[in-house]
A protein has these predicted regions:
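Glycine-rich phosphate-binding loop
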Residues: 90-108
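Interdomain "switch/hinge" adjacent to the Bergerat
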Residues: 1-3, 38-94, 119-288, 294-295, ...
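Glycine-rich ATP-binding loops of the HATPase_c
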Residues: 110-114
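Conserved ATP-binding N-box helix of the HATPase_c
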Residues: 17-53, 100-106
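P-loop NTPase nucleotide-binding/switch module
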Residues: 1-12
Length: 385
Protein backbone atom coordinates (compact mmCIF):
# COMPACT_ATOMS: atom_id res chain seq x y z
CA UNK A 1 0.00 0.00 0.00
CA UNK A 2 1.29 3.47 -0.91
CA UNK A 3 2.61 5.76 1.84
CA UNK A 4 1.12 9.25 2.05
CA UNK A 5 3.94 11.61 2.99
CA UNK A 6 3.70 14.65 5.23
CA UNK A 7 3.98 17.08 2.30
CA UNK A 8 0.33 16.39 1.50
CA UNK A 9 -0.63 17.72 4.93
CA UNK A 10 1.59 20.76 4.41
CA UNK A 11 -0.10 21.48 1.08
CA UNK A 12 -3.52 21.34 2.76
CA UNK A 13 -2.60 23.61 5.67
CA UNK A 14 0.40 25.94 5.67
CA UNK A 15 0.79 25.86 1.89
CA UNK A 16 -2.86 26.07 0.86
CA UNK A 17 -3.77 29.76 0.91
CA UNK A 18 -1.91 33.00 0.21
CA UNK A 19 -4.37 35.04 2.29
CA UNK A 20 -4.84 33.95 5.91
CA UNK A 21 -8.35 35.51 6.03
CA UNK A 22 -9.51 32.62 3.87
CA UNK A 23 -9.92 30.58 7.08
CA UNK A 24 -13.02 32.64 7.84
CA UNK A 25 -14.48 31.89 4.43
CA UNK A 26 -13.80 28.17 4.81
CA UNK A 27 -15.38 27.86 8.26
CA UNK A 28 -18.36 30.04 7.34
CA UNK A 29 -18.82 27.97 4.17
CA UNK A 30 -18.88 24.74 6.18
CA UNK A 31 -21.34 26.25 8.66
CA UNK A 32 -23.69 27.33 5.86
CA UNK A 33 -23.70 23.83 4.36
CA UNK A 34 -24.73 22.42 7.73
CA UNK A 35 -27.41 25.08 8.15
CA UNK A 36 -28.92 23.93 4.85
CA UNK A 37 -29.00 20.37 6.17
CA UNK A 38 -30.45 21.45 9.52
CA UNK A 39 -33.26 23.33 7.78
CA UNK A 40 -33.93 20.35 5.49
CA UNK A 41 -34.12 18.02 8.52
CA UNK A 42 -36.42 20.39 10.39
CA UNK A 43 -33.91 20.90 13.20
CA UNK A 44 -34.10 24.68 12.85
CA UNK A 45 -35.91 27.36 10.85
CA UNK A 46 -33.72 29.30 8.43
CA UNK A 47 -34.55 32.58 10.19
CA UNK A 48 -33.14 31.16 13.44
CA UNK A 49 -29.97 29.77 11.88
CA UNK A 50 -26.82 31.76 12.54
CA UNK A 51 -23.06 31.72 12.24
CA UNK A 52 -21.37 33.39 15.20
CA UNK A 53 -17.78 34.60 14.87
CA UNK A 54 -16.01 35.70 18.02
CA UNK A 55 -12.67 37.51 17.91
CA UNK A 56 -10.83 38.21 21.16
CA UNK A 57 -7.75 40.20 20.24
CA UNK A 58 -6.28 40.36 23.74
CA UNK A 59 -6.54 36.58 24.12
CA UNK A 60 -5.44 35.91 20.50
CA UNK A 61 -8.53 33.74 20.19
CA UNK A 62 -11.03 33.13 17.37
CA UNK A 63 -14.14 30.96 17.29
CA UNK A 64 -16.66 30.23 14.54
CA UNK A 65 -19.86 28.56 15.72
CA UNK A 66 -23.14 27.59 14.08
CA UNK A 67 -26.42 26.30 15.48
CA UNK A 68 -26.95 23.80 12.66
CA UNK A 69 -26.95 20.00 12.80
CA UNK A 70 -23.80 19.30 14.75
CA UNK A 71 -22.16 15.88 14.33
CA UNK A 72 -23.39 12.65 15.87
CA UNK A 73 -21.09 11.11 18.47
CA UNK A 74 -20.89 7.86 16.47
CA UNK A 75 -19.76 9.71 13.33
CA UNK A 76 -17.51 12.29 14.93
CA UNK A 77 -14.05 10.71 14.71
CA UNK A 78 -14.48 9.43 11.16
CA UNK A 79 -16.09 12.62 9.88
CA UNK A 80 -13.63 15.04 11.46
CA UNK A 81 -10.51 12.87 11.40
CA UNK A 82 -10.64 11.85 7.74
CA UNK A 83 -8.90 14.03 5.18
CA UNK A 84 -10.38 14.79 1.74
CA UNK A 85 -13.08 12.16 2.29
CA UNK A 86 -16.16 14.35 2.46
CA UNK A 87 -19.65 13.04 1.74
CA UNK A 88 -20.72 16.46 0.44
CA UNK A 89 -21.97 16.74 -3.14
CA UNK A 90 -20.47 18.77 -5.97
CA UNK A 91 -23.00 21.29 -7.26
CA UNK A 92 -25.12 21.04 -4.12
CA UNK A 93 -22.86 21.85 -1.18
CA UNK A 94 -20.70 24.96 -1.08
CA UNK A 95 -17.70 22.97 0.13
CA UNK A 96 -17.17 19.39 -0.91
CA UNK A 97 -13.50 18.38 -0.76
CA UNK A 98 -13.21 17.72 2.98
CA UNK A 99 -10.03 19.78 3.39
CA UNK A 100 -11.18 23.28 4.39
CA UNK A 101 -11.63 22.48 8.08
CA UNK A 102 -7.86 21.88 8.38
CA UNK A 103 -6.95 25.41 7.28
CA UNK A 104 -6.88 26.75 10.84
CA UNK A 105 -3.91 24.51 11.65
CA UNK A 106 -1.61 26.95 9.85
CA UNK A 107 -2.51 29.99 11.94
CA UNK A 108 -2.76 29.02 15.62
CA UNK A 109 -1.12 26.93 18.32
CA UNK A 110 -4.19 24.81 19.05
CA UNK A 111 -7.24 24.04 16.92
CA UNK A 112 -10.38 22.64 18.58
CA UNK A 113 -13.59 21.23 17.09
CA UNK A 114 -16.49 20.70 19.49
CA UNK A 115 -20.02 19.66 18.62
CA UNK A 116 -23.30 18.21 19.78
CA UNK A 117 -26.14 16.63 17.82
CA UNK A 118 -29.75 17.27 18.79
CA UNK A 119 -31.16 14.45 20.92
CA UNK A 120 -27.79 13.25 22.23
CA UNK A 121 -26.61 13.80 25.80
CA UNK A 122 -22.91 13.81 24.94
CA UNK A 123 -20.87 16.32 23.03
CA UNK A 124 -17.65 15.49 21.19
CA UNK A 125 -14.35 17.36 21.06
CA UNK A 126 -11.27 16.99 18.85
CA UNK A 127 -8.09 18.87 19.73
CA UNK A 128 -5.20 19.45 17.28
CA UNK A 129 -1.75 20.47 18.47
CA UNK A 130 -1.11 22.75 15.50
CA UNK A 131 2.26 23.95 16.80
CA UNK A 132 3.52 20.37 16.99
CA UNK A 133 2.20 19.67 13.50
CA UNK A 134 4.23 22.53 12.04
CA UNK A 135 7.32 21.35 13.92
CA UNK A 136 6.90 17.86 12.46
CA UNK A 137 6.32 19.26 8.98
CA UNK A 138 9.55 21.27 9.14
CA UNK A 139 11.54 18.35 10.60
CA UNK A 140 13.92 16.43 8.29
CA UNK A 141 12.24 13.22 9.47
CA UNK A 142 10.03 11.67 6.77
CA UNK A 143 6.83 11.43 8.77
CA UNK A 144 3.68 10.09 7.14
CA UNK A 145 0.31 11.81 7.44
CA UNK A 146 -0.74 9.03 9.83
CA UNK A 147 2.35 9.65 11.97
CA UNK A 148 1.54 13.32 12.33
CA UNK A 149 -2.20 12.97 12.86
CA UNK A 150 -1.59 10.29 15.47
CA UNK A 151 0.78 12.59 17.33
CA UNK A 152 -1.26 15.79 17.27
CA UNK A 153 -4.92 14.73 17.58
CA UNK A 154 -6.82 13.83 20.73
CA UNK A 155 -10.56 13.31 21.25
CA UNK A 156 -12.94 13.29 24.16
CA UNK A 157 -16.65 13.42 24.98
CA UNK A 158 -18.43 15.61 27.50
CA UNK A 159 -21.95 15.89 28.96
CA UNK A 160 -24.28 18.12 26.95
CA UNK A 161 -27.93 19.16 27.04
CA UNK A 162 -30.10 16.93 24.87
CA UNK A 163 -31.61 19.80 22.88
CA UNK A 164 -28.28 21.45 22.02
CA UNK A 165 -27.09 21.28 18.41
CA UNK A 166 -24.01 23.14 17.21
CA UNK A 167 -20.55 22.94 15.72
CA UNK A 168 -17.77 25.16 17.03
CA UNK A 169 -14.26 25.83 15.75
CA UNK A 170 -11.79 27.41 18.15
CA UNK A 171 -8.37 28.73 17.17
CA UNK A 172 -6.33 29.28 20.31
CA UNK A 173 -3.21 31.45 20.47
CA UNK A 174 -3.17 32.90 16.96
CA UNK A 175 0.35 33.15 15.52
CA UNK A 176 1.93 36.60 15.86
CA UNK A 177 2.60 36.73 12.13
CA UNK A 178 -1.15 36.33 11.58
CA UNK A 179 -2.31 39.16 13.84
CA UNK A 180 -4.48 40.54 11.01
CA UNK A 181 -6.89 37.70 11.74
CA UNK A 182 -7.70 39.45 15.03
CA UNK A 183 -8.64 42.76 13.39
CA UNK A 184 -12.43 42.77 13.73
CA UNK A 185 -12.99 45.55 11.19
CA UNK A 186 -10.67 43.99 8.62
CA UNK A 187 -12.38 40.61 9.00
CA UNK A 188 -15.86 42.15 8.80
CA UNK A 189 -14.96 44.09 5.65
CA UNK A 190 -13.52 40.94 4.07
CA UNK A 191 -16.52 38.75 4.88
CA UNK A 192 -19.07 41.38 3.86
CA UNK A 193 -18.23 40.63 0.22
CA UNK A 194 -16.86 37.10 0.43
CA UNK A 195 -19.50 35.43 2.64
CA UNK A 196 -23.08 34.57 1.60
CA UNK A 197 -24.76 37.42 3.45
CA UNK A 198 -27.71 39.67 2.48
CA UNK A 199 -27.47 43.05 0.77
CA UNK A 200 -27.53 45.97 3.18
CA UNK A 201 -31.08 47.34 3.52
CA UNK A 202 -30.08 50.79 2.29
CA UNK A 203 -29.08 49.48 -1.15
CA UNK A 204 -32.01 50.63 -3.30
CA UNK A 205 -31.58 48.08 -6.06
CA UNK A 206 -31.60 44.88 -4.02
CA UNK A 207 -35.31 44.20 -4.74
CA UNK A 208 -34.67 44.37 -8.49
CA UNK A 209 -31.84 41.85 -8.07
CA UNK A 210 -34.03 39.47 -6.06
CA UNK A 211 -36.81 39.79 -8.64
CA UNK A 212 -34.49 38.92 -11.52
CA UNK A 213 -33.14 35.93 -9.59
CA UNK A 214 -36.71 34.75 -8.95
CA UNK A 215 -37.55 35.09 -12.66
CA UNK A 216 -34.76 32.58 -13.32
CA UNK A 217 -35.94 30.31 -10.47
CA UNK A 218 -32.60 31.00 -8.83
CA UNK A 219 -32.28 31.39 -5.09
CA UNK A 220 -29.55 33.66 -3.77
CA UNK A 221 -28.37 31.82 -0.65
CA UNK A 222 -28.17 34.20 2.30
CA UNK A 223 -27.27 33.49 5.92
CA UNK A 224 -27.12 35.35 9.21
CA UNK A 225 -23.42 35.81 9.97
CA UNK A 226 -22.19 37.90 12.90
CA UNK A 227 -18.77 39.14 13.98
CA UNK A 228 -18.74 39.87 17.71
CA UNK A 229 -22.50 40.32 17.66
CA UNK A 230 -22.59 42.63 14.63
CA UNK A 231 -24.48 41.23 11.61
CA UNK A 232 -22.74 41.28 8.24
CA UNK A 233 -24.19 42.61 4.99
CA UNK A 234 -22.91 43.18 1.47
CA UNK A 235 -21.96 46.85 1.63
CA UNK A 236 -23.31 48.04 -1.70
CA UNK A 237 -23.86 51.81 -1.87
CA UNK A 238 -26.26 53.83 -4.01
CA UNK A 239 -23.67 56.52 -4.67
CA UNK A 240 -20.07 56.52 -5.85
CA UNK A 241 -17.58 58.51 -3.84
CA UNK A 242 -14.23 60.27 -3.99
CA UNK A 243 -12.06 60.76 -0.92
CA UNK A 244 -11.54 64.52 -0.69
CA UNK A 245 -9.40 64.46 2.45
CA UNK A 246 -7.08 61.47 2.72
CA UNK A 247 -6.16 62.24 6.32
CA UNK A 248 -9.72 62.28 7.63
CA UNK A 249 -11.10 60.03 4.89
CA UNK A 250 -13.79 62.57 4.01
CA UNK A 251 -15.94 61.30 1.11
CA UNK A 252 -17.85 63.24 -1.52
CA UNK A 253 -20.35 61.70 -3.96
CA UNK A 254 -19.50 62.22 -7.63
CA UNK A 255 -21.94 59.76 -9.28
CA UNK A 256 -24.72 57.35 -8.40
CA UNK A 257 -26.00 53.90 -9.31
CA UNK A 258 -29.19 55.03 -11.03
CA UNK A 259 -30.36 51.51 -11.89
CA UNK A 260 -29.15 47.96 -12.36
CA UNK A 261 -29.10 45.98 -15.60
CA UNK A 262 -28.96 42.21 -16.10
CA UNK A 263 -27.42 39.66 -18.43
CA UNK A 264 -28.11 35.92 -18.56
CA UNK A 265 -25.52 33.52 -19.98
CA UNK A 266 -26.84 30.27 -21.48
CA UNK A 267 -24.93 27.36 -22.98
CA UNK A 268 -25.30 25.85 -26.45
CA UNK A 269 -28.17 23.70 -25.14
CA UNK A 270 -30.07 26.67 -23.79
CA UNK A 271 -29.22 25.87 -20.17
CA UNK A 272 -28.41 28.73 -17.82
CA UNK A 273 -24.67 28.95 -17.09
CA UNK A 274 -24.69 32.13 -15.04
CA UNK A 275 -26.35 35.52 -14.72
CA UNK A 276 -25.20 38.93 -13.63
CA UNK A 277 -26.32 42.35 -12.51
CA UNK A 278 -24.32 45.51 -12.91
CA UNK A 279 -24.83 49.07 -11.78
CA UNK A 280 -25.66 51.73 -14.34
CA UNK A 281 -24.15 55.15 -13.66
CA UNK A 282 -22.76 58.03 -15.69
CA UNK A 283 -19.46 56.11 -15.75
CA UNK A 284 -17.62 59.30 -14.84
CA UNK A 285 -14.34 57.48 -14.23
CA UNK A 286 -12.76 54.36 -12.80
CA UNK A 287 -14.34 53.90 -9.38
CA UNK A 288 -11.87 54.70 -6.56
CA UNK A 289 -11.65 51.55 -4.44
CA UNK A 290 -10.59 53.35 -1.27
CA UNK A 291 -13.95 55.13 -1.09
CA UNK A 292 -16.03 52.39 -2.73
CA UNK A 293 -15.22 48.93 -1.34
CA UNK A 294 -17.86 47.33 -3.59
CA UNK A 295 -16.12 48.36 -6.84
CA UNK A 296 -15.53 45.81 -9.59
CA UNK A 297 -17.55 42.87 -10.88
CA UNK A 298 -17.41 39.87 -8.54
CA UNK A 299 -18.05 36.20 -9.35
CA UNK A 300 -20.07 34.17 -6.86
CA UNK A 301 -20.96 30.51 -6.54
CA UNK A 302 -23.38 29.55 -3.78
CA UNK A 303 -23.27 33.30 -3.07
CA UNK A 304 -19.65 32.91 -1.92
CA UNK A 305 -17.11 34.98 -3.80
CA UNK A 306 -14.76 33.34 -6.28
CA UNK A 307 -11.42 35.15 -6.38
CA UNK A 308 -11.69 38.89 -5.71
CA UNK A 309 -12.97 42.08 -7.32
CA UNK A 310 -10.34 41.82 -10.09
CA UNK A 311 -10.89 38.19 -11.13
CA UNK A 312 -12.84 39.01 -14.32
CA UNK A 313 -10.81 42.10 -15.28
CA UNK A 314 -8.85 40.02 -17.82
CA UNK A 315 -12.01 39.53 -19.90
CA UNK A 316 -12.39 43.25 -20.61
CA UNK A 317 -10.94 44.82 -23.73
CA UNK A 318 -8.75 46.78 -21.31
CA UNK A 319 -8.43 45.53 -17.74
CA UNK A 320 -9.21 48.92 -16.25
CA UNK A 321 -12.72 48.52 -17.64
CA UNK A 322 -13.65 46.36 -14.67
CA UNK A 323 -13.07 49.31 -12.32
CA UNK A 324 -15.89 51.30 -13.96
CA UNK A 325 -18.49 48.85 -12.69
CA UNK A 326 -20.05 47.36 -9.61
CA UNK A 327 -22.00 44.12 -9.79
CA UNK A 328 -22.10 40.37 -9.32
CA UNK A 329 -21.95 37.33 -11.58
CA UNK A 330 -23.74 34.31 -10.12
CA UNK A 331 -22.58 30.90 -11.35
CA UNK A 332 -25.53 28.55 -11.89
CA UNK A 333 -24.28 25.53 -13.86
CA UNK A 334 -23.09 22.56 -11.83
CA UNK A 335 -20.23 22.35 -14.32
CA UNK A 336 -18.80 25.57 -12.89
CA UNK A 337 -16.89 23.95 -10.02
CA UNK A 338 -14.70 26.11 -7.75
CA UNK A 339 -11.08 25.02 -7.54
CA UNK A 340 -9.52 24.19 -4.16
CA UNK A 341 -8.32 27.79 -3.59
CA UNK A 342 -11.71 29.11 -4.73
CA UNK A 343 -9.98 31.74 -6.86
CA UNK A 344 -11.37 30.35 -10.13
CA UNK A 345 -13.30 27.40 -11.53
CA UNK A 346 -11.90 24.03 -12.53
CA UNK A 347 -11.16 23.68 -16.23
CA UNK A 348 -14.36 22.25 -17.69
CA UNK A 349 -16.35 22.66 -20.89
CA UNK A 350 -18.77 24.86 -18.96
CA UNK A 351 -15.97 27.14 -17.76
CA UNK A 352 -14.68 27.61 -21.31
CA UNK A 353 -18.16 28.49 -22.58
CA UNK A 354 -18.82 30.78 -19.61
CA UNK A 355 -15.58 32.69 -20.08
CA UNK A 356 -16.12 32.96 -23.84
CA UNK A 357 -19.55 34.50 -23.33
CA UNK A 358 -18.33 36.74 -20.53
CA UNK A 359 -15.56 38.14 -22.72
CA UNK A 360 -17.96 38.76 -25.62
CA UNK A 361 -20.42 40.62 -23.39
CA UNK A 362 -17.68 42.68 -21.78
CA UNK A 363 -16.24 43.57 -25.22
CA UNK A 364 -19.53 44.22 -27.02
CA UNK A 365 -21.60 45.84 -24.27
CA UNK A 366 -19.76 46.90 -21.13
CA UNK A 367 -16.73 48.35 -22.91
CA UNK A 368 -18.99 50.47 -25.11
CA UNK A 369 -20.97 51.67 -22.10
CA UNK A 370 -18.10 53.33 -20.29
CA UNK A 371 -16.12 54.17 -23.43
CA UNK A 372 -19.04 56.00 -25.08
CA UNK A 373 -19.81 57.80 -21.82
CA UNK A 374 -16.22 59.03 -21.75
CA UNK A 375 -16.29 60.03 -25.42
CA UNK A 376 -19.53 61.97 -24.91
CA UNK A 377 -18.08 63.86 -21.94
CA UNK A 378 -14.93 64.73 -23.88
CA UNK A 379 -17.02 65.93 -26.84
CA UNK A 380 -19.04 68.14 -24.53
CA UNK A 381 -15.90 69.60 -22.98
CA UNK A 382 -14.45 70.44 -26.41
CA UNK A 383 -17.66 72.20 -27.49
CA UNK A 384 -17.60 74.39 -24.38
CA UNK A 385 -14.20 75.81 -25.27
Amino acid sequence: MATIGKNILENLTTGMYADSKVIYREYVQNACDQIDKAVELGIIDREQAEVFISIKEDERFISVEDNATGVKEADFVAQLGDIANSDKKVGVDKGFRGIGRLCGLAYCKTLVFSTSYKGETKGSKMVFDAKKMREMLSSPVKYTVDDIMGAIVSTETFPEEQEKHYFKVEMIDINHENTDLLDKQLVSDYLSFVAPVPYVNSFHHRDAIYEHAASLHFKIDEYNVEVNGNPLFKKYQNRLYDITNATNKVKKAYDEISSVAFKDFVDSNGQLLAWMWYGVSRFEKAIPKAANPMCGLRVRQGNIQIGDNTTVAKFFKEERGNSYFVGEIFAVSKGLIPNSQRDNFNETVERVEFETQLKKFFYDTLHKLYYMASATRNYGKRNKK
